[in-house]
Swiss-Prot record:
Belongs to the DarP family. GO terms for biological process: assembly of large subunit precursor of preribosome. Keywords: Cytoplasm, Ribosome biogenesis, RNA-binding, rRNA-binding. GO terms for molecular function: ribosome binding; rRNA binding. This is Dual-action ribosomal maturation protein DarP. Member of a network of 50S ribosomal subunit biogenesis factors which assembles along the 30S-50S interface, preventing incorrect 23S rRNA structures from forming. Promotes peptidyl transferase center (PTC) maturation. It comes from Neisseria meningitidis serogroup A / serotype 4A (strain DSM 15465 / Z2491). It is found in: Cytoplasm. It holds the Pfam family DarP. One of its GO terms (cellular component) is cytoplasm. SUPFAM superfamilies: PSPTO4464-like.
Length: 170
């Protein structure tokens, strides 16, 4: 016990860590049961979260939240945090990919020759469908209509770029 003096944590620091784990557990209670199964939680933690969702009494909710926090202490929070970050869209790689898709859409709408370049980068893309979406998007913008085709173009580009390299890295 005396060898671990350099790793000593104050009681306040420990409480902050425990509250952080309890907050992470509370984020889990907001997810659907199917999503919870995808995370791969311990069976006890999964059952505690599902039970929390069924409870209606405020006192019991508080006790169950503390129990979830207690179970979180025995669980590695890193995979859970990573999964939740990905769900929230905080994943930096995913954000960078979405920015590349947006840049491709802007280029395609601004320059008629950009489609040829895009097709050489992504030969499996459906040129006819992209050409139609680009034309309809330009018409939409001229007539100040809701951006239905603008969004459809983004989704099509995203699908094409994802199928090339998982995250769209060409």
């Amino acid at each position: 016990m005396f060898e671990q003096e350099d790793e000593w944590i104050s009681k306040t620091q420990m409480k902050k860590q425990m509250n952080g784990l309890q907050d992470l557990g509370m984020e889990l209670t907001k997810l659907s049961n199917d999503t919870l199964k995808k995370i791969g939680l311990d069976e006890d933690l999964y059952e505690a979260v599902v039970t929390y969702k069924k409870i209606t009494s405020n006192g019991a909710l508080k006790r169950q939240a503390q129990f979830i926090g207690r179970l979180m202490r025995d669980t590695d929070p890193a995979p859970i945090e990573a999964f939740l970050a990905k769900l929230r869209g905080d994943d930096a790689a995913h954000n960078a990919f979405l920015q590349r898709v947006e840049q491709a859409r802007v280029r395609l709408l601004a320059d008629d020759g950009a489609l040829t370049q895009f097709m050489s980068d992504f030969p499996h893309a459906d040129a006819g469908k992209l050409r139609t979406l680009i034309r309809n998007t330009k018409k939409e913008q001229e007539q100040n209509k809701p951006p239905k085709n603008f969004r459809a173009l983004f989704q099509e580009l995203k699908t094409v770029m994802e199928s090339q390299g998982g995250t769209g890295e060409a």
